[in-house]
Amino acid sequence: FTSTDRAKMFYYRGYIYFSQEKYGLAETAYKNLIAEEDSSDQERQGAIYSLSQLRYIAEDYKGSITYLLEWLDNEEEPSSDGYGLLAQAYYQVENFQKSVEAVDTAIDIQESRDIPIKVAVLDAEGNETGEMIETGETRKGVAKENHYLLKMALYSELKKDLEVLPIYEILVQYYPKKRYWTNLSGLY
């Protein structure tokens, strides 16, 4: 096997072990991948991100943060999920200010996306065919519900209770649940 072949083998082993919840074996495979000199940047980055998740699962939040910061340093377009995980890890170690910064970045990434508006295609009788077409228009992206909820929890920890009002307004618009309406009305 070449170093490149071994790197691919370690990548797939890590992936399989992770999906089978054999976290120790997955971690070993990903660390072996990183040690391979001919592993690609993409494989290395994927392994580092997976290691951050594995450290989080093991409740080693500082280890998770270390891997996530390394991943962010080398990732051209970091995902909102990466920042969301970083925010959760910072929350767990009670670094609430850094957690707010990370969750704000996650939300900004998601809200800055332009989502194409799609409509259903109708047949001659006016029934939906199951096919969707884009209208050419877009709408603003919306962050994941759990990112908004984490931000509210952080504001509570930081004693900024009134700052949750705009978050509840977003939640009732995009994730309408009775508890959000109840809490929003209580703030007014």
Annotate each PLM feature.
Residues 3-11, 40-50, 75-85, 114-116, ...:
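Generic helix N-cap/helix-start motif at coil->alpha-helix transitions
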